[in-house]
Amino acid sequence: MPEGPEIRRAADNLEAAIKGKPLTDVWFAFAQLKPYESQLTGQLVTRIETRGKALLTHFSNGLTLYSHNQLYGVWRVIDTGEIPQTTRILRVRLQTADKTILLYSASDIEMLTAEQLTTHPFLQRVGPDVLDARLTPEEVKVRLLSPRFRNRQFSGLLLDQAFLAGLGNYLRVEILWQVGLTGQHKAKDLNEAQLNALSHALLDIPRLSYTTRGQSDENKHHGALFRFKVFHRDGEACERCGGIIEKTTLSSRPFYWCPHCQK
């Protein structure tokens, strides 16, 4: 499943295609959304927001389309009039004069008013988004030490969207390697230096992944761009200590780590 950085980049692509342009045609697959087709035609997409792995498409008439891709949903951008060759099931089509965005295969789709947006169960449950520039390491540290989370093993905590939205398995693996901790650690057992390092890594690594993953580092500045240090690298040497990276399963997900330097 895509994690926060991938969802945010997808939202950026959708925004670039249709933000601020009048919608010339709107189509929904689900019967409960059909009444909104005429209401949205002629409106503008004003913003596409991410809350962890959910997308909120905001319209100029005050409505918001909530969608969660879950395992199989995917958005696509096409030229208006193009007919994509795919076996996926179309759920949403938002069309402008030149570009159209399509949502395939997702099933968790709702239209929300401004009031419903504040009471939606998933949005109420989800924690602060790691890509929200307003979120600080100090606030993350307070969250780590809160009664709700301080006694949770990191193996499960770093997958829990109620703790921090946008984290997922590869980020869990890379964050814990960065700070030299294992999945069995808990916040209550860390010293001040470890807590500070983890609080920063929980924001720095997702943000680095969002801004630079997939880009080439032409100047060869080590560490300037995101790349996997341990994820999917079992059997290779750890670049920090030379130990051999191992693979196991934690919280029902593959987990990669270096037993030599993650203590």
From Swiss-Prot:
Pfam family, one: H2TH
CDD domains for the chain: EcNei-like_N
Enzyme Commission number(s): 3.2.2.-, 4.2.99.18
Note describing how the cofactor binds: Binds 1 zinc ion per subunit.
GO process terms (BP): base-excision repair
Residues noted as binding DNA in the record, renumbered to the chain: Q70, R125, N169
Reactions accelerated catalytically: 2'-deoxyribonucleotide-(2'-deoxyribose 5'-phosphate)-2'-deoxyribonucleotide-DNA = a 3'-end 2'-deoxyribonucleotide-(2,3-dehydro-2,3-deoxyribose 5'-phosphate)-DNA + a 5'-end 5'-phospho-2'-deoxyribonucleoside-DNA + H(+)
The name this protein goes by in its record: Endonuclease 8
Species of the source: Salmonella dublin (strain CT_02021853)
